[in-house]
Amino acid sequence: MWLFALLVTLFYGVEGSIYLPQKLYGEVTSPLYPKPYPSDLETTTVITVPMGYRVKLVFWQFDVEPSEGCFYDYVKISADKQTLGRFCGQLDSPLGNPPGSKEFMSQGNKMLLTFHTDFSNEENGTIMFYKGFLAYYQAVDLDECASQPNSVEEGLQPRCQHLCHNYVGGYFCSCHPGYELQKDGQSCQAECSSELYTEPSGYVSSLEYPQPYPPDLRCNYSIRVERGLTVHLKFLDPFEIDDHQQVHCPYDQLQIYANGKNLGEFCGKQRPPDLDTSSNAVDLLFFTDESGDSRGWKLHYTTETIKCPQPKALDEFTIIQDPQPQYQFRDYFIVTCKQGYQLMEGNQALLSFTAVCQNDGTWHRAMPRCKIKNCGQPQSLSNGDFRYITTKGVTTYEASIQYHCHEPYYKMLTRAGSSESMRGIYTCTAQGIWKNEEEGEKMPRCLPVCGKPVNPVTQKERIIRGQPARPGNFPWQAFTTTHGRGGGALLGDRWILTAAHTIYPKHHNKENDNANPKMLVFLGHTNVEQIKKLGHHPVRRVIIHPDYRQDEPNNFEGDIALLELENSVTLGPELLPICLPDNETFYGQGLMGYVSGFGITEDKLAFDLRFVRLPVADSEACQRWLQTKKDTSPFSQNMFCSGDPAVQQDACQGDSGGVFAVRDRNRDIWVATGIVSWGIGCGEGYGFYTKVLNYVDWIKKEMGDEN
């Protein structure tokens, strides 16, 4: 027994108080738990949690010698200078006074557990062993602001003079409006010199209302709401401010200001009328003297959004979208125009218009006007013109014009299937753009009319020798000078069809030729002297067919070339293009054609354009004739011949490059079926021509298929 007592002493130290470390939770046990506790012992365990918390204790195991009144062994729980209970026995046992599952709670942050045992644990002469107890504790938030009638521990009852606010682990104090918390953090003192209200509505009152207000006040209540709102004041009953029957408000008074203007000074028992301040900034100044017992005043303030004037259109074409019965601050309206009209702000065109009601009751933009859309002067049409269908010179919305080409020399290009009635008609649209119903914004094009001479050749009898051409007989005729005289024919309005050998002659050494020989092209007259006076047309590009071989003197295969002029020419009665062939019928034996040129006639240079009428000859006859002349020049499928050996008529030197022109009677157009290429002598037999039909695809490809 002595040794057991010694071990207890070594384990617990001396009897007395045991202070547990301050924590938010933990456990408490009897000495040596779960082994039997020693005899003749008394210890007090002190449980402490942080300030602002209470201690909650629950027993999980309890096995202490039972006795009536827990006289021998017991556990005593104390807190806040009060005993919460004295316990012994076993849990769930009727003997003694076990704590069961009861929760023990302190009011402060401290709790004491005193464990007492007597000198022995005997029952009917038998020594009994008891395990003791196991308990858990935890910190629980203390609501310092709640009523604590049983708390006697100093410092637990909060001393907030006005308002108390609890939080986990503590509390803080605050004051009623118009009072200021003092340095002690608990007491409040009247302070209303700068009270600010910013909500759109609320209540304002004197201090302690409806109880008498304090003396010696100098209060300033400021209402500041968002710009664009106006403040309305409505005073409530009761309204009591000390006054005097003979002198107006000599003691206490309430002054109201809005926008720096004094709206009145009020006192007595008659509440002021409702006030519309027309301002978003209102100040209420309340002054009191050192005495009085009036109950003061209270008001309810509300706000209303400021209004802007109703928008009004400046003209009949202006549309105000979704008009409202009234417009307030931040409301807006949108303006559009009737179709065909443009929004205008001063001289500036607008894509859209929105005006916003400002906080001063004005619109942030002035109302615009609607001006009729103007498409402007119609574009000029190359080789054409236009006329006004509607009022002349008017180019505004719904105005109409019609383009036309300079006929009969040009015709208008339109898409397939387009309506004849809408051809060239353009209307000024609501977008301010000239537009055709079928072509859209795309401008029409005037294309040259080919093969329609104004004064065509009408001679039907055979011509024995060439004769002078009259103006307009062969308006496609070109006069060229490169290595001497040559001819050509106008295609479209900026291309010349000619023979390649007029540019790169067979008898010239190619190495001595310039890469770009000087080409002079003349058009528009039948007289050499006059045609030169009209001036030459600069050549932008020379295109030789790839089959042409300059270095093979007797081979005229591919003897065809195109000259692209720098500028398009203006067509007229003496300057018109010729058409290209589209079928083999133009090459039937005996079909008559015309060859024109400024070449040699009767061994002399011609100064006037001359022409000759020739039949298409039989190819086999031409081949046999060449054999009789012992000429080895190739006569291929890309060539044809014309003339009659029995009749001395033919193209001659200087006519090269000119065309063999045939009239298509079905379409009443003239077609260039051949190009004067080569022959033997002048007027001594057949002449040989480049067959244009075989080169039409190449021609169109090089010209871009634009004519």
Swiss-Prot record:
GO terms for cellular component: extracellular region. Residues 463-704 form the Peptidase S1 domain. Disulfide bonds join C70-C88, C145-C164, C160-C173, C175-C188, C192-C219, C249-C267, C308-C357, C337-C370, C375-C428, C405-C446, C450-C579, C622-C641, C652-C682. The record marks R462, I463 as: Cleavage. The active site is at H501, D559, S656. It comes from the Eukaryota. Ca(2+) 2 binds at D141, L142, E144, N166, Y167, G170. GO terms for biological process: complement activation, classical pathway; innate immune response; proteolysis. Residues 306-372, 373-448 form the Sushi domain. Cleaved and activated by autocatalytic processing to generate Complement C1r subcomponent heavy and light chains that are connected by disulfide bonds. The modification (3R)-3-hydroxyasparagine is found at N166. Its EC number is 3.4.21.41. SUPFAM superfamilies: Complement control module/SCR domain, EGF/Laminin, Spermadhesin, CUB domain, Trypsin-like serine proteases. The keyword Calcium applies. Residues 1-16 form the signal peptide. It is found in: Secreted; Cell surface. Keywords: Autocatalytic cleavage, Calcium, Complement pathway, Disulfide bond, EGF-like domain, Glycoprotein, Hydrolase, Hydroxylation, Immunity, Innate immunity, Metal-binding, Phosphoprotein, Protease, Repeat, Secreted, Serine protease, Signal, Sushi. Residues 141-189 form the EGF-like domain. Pfam families: CUB, FXa_inhibition, Sushi, Trypsin. Activated by the C1Q subcomplex of the C1 complex following C1Q binding to immunoglobulins (IgG or IgM) complexed with antigens to form antigen-antibody complexes on the surface of pathogens. Immunoglobulin-binding promotes autoactivation of C1R, which results in the cleavage of the Arg-Ile bond in the catalytic domain. The CUB domain 2 shows a compact folded structure in the presence of Ca(2+), whereas it has a flexible, disordered conformation in the absence of Ca(2+). Ca(2+) could provide a switch between the folded and disordered forms; low Ca(2+) could provide flexibility to promote autoprocessing and activation of CIR. Belongs to the peptidase S1 family. Serine protease component of the complement C1 complex, a multiprotein complex that initiates the classical pathway of the complement system, a cascade of proteins that leads to phagocytosis and breakdown of pathogens and signaling that strengthens the adaptive immune system. C1R catalyzes the first enzymatic step in the classical complement pathway: it is activated by the C1Q subcomplex of the C1 complex, which associates with IgG or IgM immunoglobulins complexed with antigens to form antigen-antibody complexes on the surface of pathogens. Core component of the complement C1 complex, a calcium-dependent complex composed of 1 molecule of the C1Q subcomplex, 2 molecules of C1R and 2 molecules of C1S. The C1Q subcomplex is composed 18 subunits: 3 chains of C1QA, C1QB, and C1QC trimerize to form 6 collagen-like triple helices connected to six globular ligand-recognition modules. Within the C1 complex, C1R is a dimer of identical chains, each of which is activated by cleavage into two chains, heavy and light, connected by disulfide bonds. This is Complement C1r-A subcomponent. It comes from Mus musculus (Mouse).
